[in-house]
Each structure stands twice: as C-alpha cells, then as structure tokens.
C-alpha cells in the first residue's frame, strides 16, 4: 500500500518558490492499477517521482507498506528502490548494450547475484515480455513497442512490488499502445504487482486502471473508481477530459439540438444494463417516443458501458424517467 499524508513539493526558481504539488493525501491499495491523469504541468510526474524518492518532498509523509520512506537514509533508500521498478516515455535504454544486457543492468549494479542466475533471470523476463528471440539485438534494431517491452523487463528485474509508469505509451502508436497496456495488465494480474501510471490519455486509464486521480495545477481535483469518475465527472477538469475523449464541443452540440423538440436527456448504462432492451420496454410502458441524438458503447477495463443522448416526447415522461432511475441507469437532463 502507498500512502501520501499531506505531501507537497515546492521548487525554488530565481528566488521564488514555485509549488509543483500542493498538500496531497492519497492511498493506493496493493495490487491496484492506479492512474494519474492530467495535462502538461499538472504535477503528475512530480507526484510519481515522489513515490520512489527521485524527488524529495518539501513536507508531508510517504508511507509504503508501513515504512516511512521520507525518513530513510541513503542505504535504506537504496534498499527501498530495489522494490520499485520504473518505465519511461523514451525507454532510457543504453544504445551500446544488447537487449539482454539492458535487462540485466539492475541486477549487475546490485552486485549480489551470480552471473549464471542473472542470465537465467534475464531469459525469464524476455520470455515474459515476448522478446526471447531479441536478446542479442541492440536498441537501434527494435521498434518503439519492443523498446518499451525491454524497459518493462528491466523494471521487473529485481522483482519489485511496485511498478511506476511515466507516460509509458505516449510515444507509441495506438496498436502498439494497446499491446503494451495488455502486457501491463497481465503483469498486474499474474504478479499481483501494484502499478501507478501517469498519462494525459483517457484511453490508457480506461483500458487498465482500477482507480484514477485527476490532477490540475498541482492539485488532485477528483479521484475514485474509473467508472465513477469518468462516467459521472464532477470537476471541470474531468469534464474537459471526457469531452476531449468523446470529441464533444458543448457549443456545437447546443446548436445541433436547438431545433429538436422534447426533453433532452443523457443516459449512462453500466455492466449488464448496457445490453438490456430497456428503451423499448420503457417506451411501451409509458407511451413516450424517443429519438437517438448521440450514442456510444465502450469498456472501462472489463466493464461495458453505454451512453445515449435522447430527445423524449409524448407519453408520461415522469414515469419514463423514474423507470430509468429504477433500473440503475444514470440520467442527466440536458434540456
């Protein structure tokens, strides 16, 4: 478990104090995939690097599995960092070393494992990330996705309890991003590894995360289960992320709906309700008519969800709306 207690970070620039992270309290449960999303300058990289003390907090307490890592001396910090792996946006591989040597680097530097055991561990890791045939290649001979897989294997070398991912997919194309995220999900599931990742992409959060924190200007403005946060956003920053992801322009949408008659509502379905024939049932029971103005079906990790924007006319609208609510469908009246 990772706990932040009133942690903050301030940089001193040209004699002025610049806050990068305002006082923050946060908990990441063991075995979770926890996502932190925010635009550039939101403070997410600072927060991530505080976990393994690549950044030193200006105040507050960071506790990992009951240990106060803010109080560790140099030896204690070195020991602690062996329990935390990290992968980076631009891979950070040594160009002059082979794939196998890059993966072996943390074990070689630790200096407490015989070479034969290092070679065995490297072979296991390359098999896990699907690169057994690339052990003797150099980074320049690999694709972006393969380089990131090497980075993941290297991060797992010391058998860490925590894996930190710093914009790990932002330099990859969509197809490669999907395969890397699938690999991270498998690692989380099979190794029971706690993963904390930062990103500016909603799709990354939606695919792999259990919980999410939304950051803006050094503050966590909203956090919780991914479905709760993104299907029912409360803060303006979260709503902007949702609108960007769905490519919604509220002004354009308002103009498009101006000529539409009736009440306009947005329905959000989760789980089994996503595929239930609810609209037809409600229309028959209450006599309302509806037109579908917009809609989508997608998944948040393993959970399907759907959203429909409807124009509702005629019949008993109050009864129809009550029926939606009774069926655990979230309804928002837009007009």
From Swiss-Prot:
Belongs to the ABC transporter superfamily. Methionine importer (TC 3.A.1.24) family. It comes from Pseudomonas syringae pv. syringae (strain B728a). It is an enzyme of class 7 (translocase). It is a peripheral membrane protein. Part of the ABC transporter complex MetNIQ involved in methionine import. Responsible for energy coupling to the transport system. SUPFAM superfamilies: ACT-like (SSF55021), P-loop containing nucleoside triphosphate hydrolases (SSF52540). CDD domains: ABC_MetN_methionine_transporter (cd03258). Residues 2-242 form the ABC transporter domain. It catalyses: L-methionine(out) + ATP + H2O = L-methionine(in) + ADP + phosphate + H(+); D-methionine(out) + ATP + H2O = D-methionine(in) + ADP + phosphate + H(+). One of its GO terms (cellular component) is plasma membrane. The gene is metN1. It comes from the Bacteria. The complex is composed of two ATP-binding proteins (MetN), two transmembrane proteins (MetI) and a solute-binding protein (MetQ). This is Methionine import ATP-binding protein MetN 1. PROSITE patterns: ABC_TRANSPORTER_1, ABC_TRANSPORTER_2, METN. GO terms for molecular function: ABC-type D-methionine transporter activity; ATP binding; ATP hydrolysis activity. Its EC number is 7.4.2.11. ATP binds at residues 38-45. It holds the Pfam family ABC_tran. Its main location: membrane. Signal peptide: none annotated. It is found in: Cell inner membrane. Keywords: Amino-acid transport, ATP-binding, Cell inner membrane, Cell membrane, Membrane, Nucleotide-binding, Translocase, Transport.
């Amino acid at each position: 478990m990772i706990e932040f207690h009133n942690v903050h970070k301030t940089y001193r620039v040209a004699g002025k104090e610049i806050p990068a992270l305002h006082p923050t309290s946060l908990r990441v449960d063991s075995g979770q995939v926890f996502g932190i999303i925010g635009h550039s300058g939101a403070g997410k990289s600072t927060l991530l690097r505080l976990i393994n003390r690549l950044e030193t907090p200006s105040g507050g307490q960071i506790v990992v599995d009951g240990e106060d890592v803010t109080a560790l001396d140099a030896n204690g910090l070195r020991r602690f960092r062996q329990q935390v792996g990290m992968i980076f946006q631009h891979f950070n591989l040594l160009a002059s070393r082979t794939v196998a040597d890059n993966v072996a680097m943390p074990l070689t530097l630790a200096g407490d494992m015989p070479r034969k055991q290092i070679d065995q561990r490297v072979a296991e890791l390359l098999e896990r990330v699907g690169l057994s045939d690339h052990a003797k290649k150099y980074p320049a001979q690999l694709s972006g996705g393969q380089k990131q897989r090497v980075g993941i294997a290297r991060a797992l070398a010391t058998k860490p309890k925590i894996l930190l991912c710093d914009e790990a997919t932002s330099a990859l194309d969509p197809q490669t991003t999907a395969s890397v995220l699938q690999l991270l999900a498998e690692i989380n599931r099979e190794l029971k590894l706690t993963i904390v990742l930062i990103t500016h992409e909603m799709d990354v959060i939606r695919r792999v995360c259990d919980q999410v924190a939304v950051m803006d200007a050094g503050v966590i403005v909203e956090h919780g289960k991914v479905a709760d946060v993104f299907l029912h956003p409360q803060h303006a920053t979260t709503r902007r992320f949702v609108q960007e992801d769905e490519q919604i322009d509220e002004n354009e949408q308002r103009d498009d709906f101006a000529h539409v008659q009736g009440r306009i509502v947005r329905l959000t379905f989760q789980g089994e309700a996503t595929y239930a024939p609810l609209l037809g049932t409600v229309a028959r029971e209450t006599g309302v008519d509806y037109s579908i103005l917009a809609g989508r079906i997608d998944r948040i990790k393993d959970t399907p969800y759907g959203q429909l924007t409807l124009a509702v006319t005629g019949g008993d609208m109050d009864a129809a709306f009550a029926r939606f609510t009774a069926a655990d469908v979230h309804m928002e009246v837009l007009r």
